[in-house]
Amino acid sequence: VYANPNKYFDQVIEIDLSTLEPHLNGPFTPDRATPVSAMKKEAEKNGWPKEVEVGLIGSCTNSSYEDISRAASIAKQAIDKKLKVQAEYTITPGSEQVRYTVQRDGFLDDLEKIGGVVLANACGPCIGQWARHTNDPDKKNTIVTSFNRNFAKRNDGNPQTHAFVASPELVTALAIAGDLTFNPVTDSLVNENGEKVMLDPPSGLELPAKGYEVEDAGYQAPAADGSHIQVDVKPDSERLQL
C-alpha cells in the first residue's frame, strides 16, 4: 500500500505537517478559521477587540488529561519565566476522575499559580453558567475558549462578546499574553524583570503514568437485594407514578 498508494485509493492527499500552525476559530461561528500568523491583519481589518479579557479551557470538550497537561506545561513556563497572566483564566475539568488525577499530578497547581480558577466538572461558561467579572456586561470585547461553540451571546449573554475557539494550550498562551494577535511561534513577551522571553512548544502526556484515580466517582451501587426497598411516591403526584 505504501509503495503504490494510487493502486489502492482513488485519491491520495499529502499533508506537510511542518507547514501547519495554530488556528483560532471565530468570532460568532466555529467555521471561521484564522491561523495565528494572520490574526493581527484580520483583527485590524474587521475591528475585532485585540485585548483578551478571559481565557476559558475545559468543559465537555478539550478537557482530557492530555489537554490539561498541555495547558499546564504552558502555565509552568509562565511561572519559570516570570510572566504575569494578563487575562482572567478558568479551568473546567472534563470529569471528577480527570480533575482528581490532574490535581494529584500537580497540573492544577501550576494552572492555579498563574491565577487560574478551577470550576465545577459540569456545564459552565460554555453555556453562560458562570459569574463573569466585567465592568461593563454590554461592551465589545474578546474572549478565547477551548469550547466547541462560540455563537453570539452563548458564553455570557452579550452579543458584543467576540469568542474565539482554540486548543487549551493556545488559549492558555493567549491568556498569558492578553493579546489576540500574539503568535506564540514567533512573538516574545516581556516578563516582570523587563526581559523578552518566548514560550516553548507545549508538551503533554496522553495518559497518566500512575493511571487514573478518583476518590468519589459519584456512583452508588444498587442494593444486592432490592426486594425490601420501599419507594414512596405521593398518591396524587402528577410527575411520578409507579
Q: Language-model features: where?
A:
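Mobile "lid/hinge" segments at catalytic clefts and subdomain interfaces of large enzymes
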Residues: 1, 83, 117, 124-219
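Long, charge-rich low-complexity segments
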Residues: 208-237
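Accessory "access/gating" subregions that flank catalytic or transport cores
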Residues: 1-135, 139-142, 228-242
